[in-house]
Amino acid sequence: MLQTFSPSYKPLHLPISSLSLSSSSSSSASSVAFPVTRLLIPPRLRVLPNPRRRCSALPFDIRGGKGMSEFYEVELKVRDYELDQYGVVNNAVYASYCQHGRHELLESFGLSCDAVARNGDALALSELSLKFLAPLRSGDKFVVKVRLSGSSAARLYFDHLIFKLPNQEPILDAKGTAVWLDKNYRPVRIPPEVRSKLVQFLRNEES
């Protein structure tokens, strides 16, 4: 028959004031052969400062990282094949205008999307929201304004504006997110050499 053994001793609760950091107290405490149900911590060690987090990425690569203060501008002209049956630029075409502006901006950083693709990576658009304000028609000249509004470890955030020329009539307001992908199309950190180019561009903009 299985019997249950109950210890005859009770757990010892030692007051904190009795704990000493001397070697003699440590040796005597280690000789106690019964469990202690209370963690004994000296008052001066009860509150420890939070450890500092180290990050190898540049300050640009944190969520909500600093972006550009000015817009990069690209002037374009509406082509006839971009029109729909109503004689205005098809809504889907504006995404291409924004893409062209982003690529021109990145090339000004020294970053070519073609070069990224040749290395096996990709800078892919993951989000794009468009707010249509007014239409463009055949032959209209307009300017696409793009800036890098922020960043995270693997993503770049862009603001896009389109204005009709020469009167600067607002046409479009758009926001986009591009994510860096590896060869398996998984999000990865933006490479250090790319971060360096972006940070250098922002520093030059401030100076």
From Swiss-Prot:
EC number: 3.1.2.-
GO MF annotations in UniProt: fatty acyl-[ACP] hydrolase activity
Compartment list: Plastid, Chloroplast
Any one Gene Ontology cellular component term annotated for this protein: chloroplast
Plastid is among the record's keywords: yes
Pfam families: 4HBT_2
Predominant location category: plastid
Family matches, as Gene3D superfamilies: Hotdog Thioesterase (3.10.129.10)
GO BP: lipid metabolic process
Family to which the UniProt record says this protein belongs: Belongs to the 4-hydroxybenzoyl-CoA thioesterase family.
Role according to the record: Acyl-ACP thioesterase involved in the production of fatty acids and beta-keto fatty acids. May play a role in cuticular wax synthesis.
Protein name according to UniProt: Acyl-acyl carrier protein thioesterase TE3, chloroplastic
Organism: Humulus lupulus (European hop)
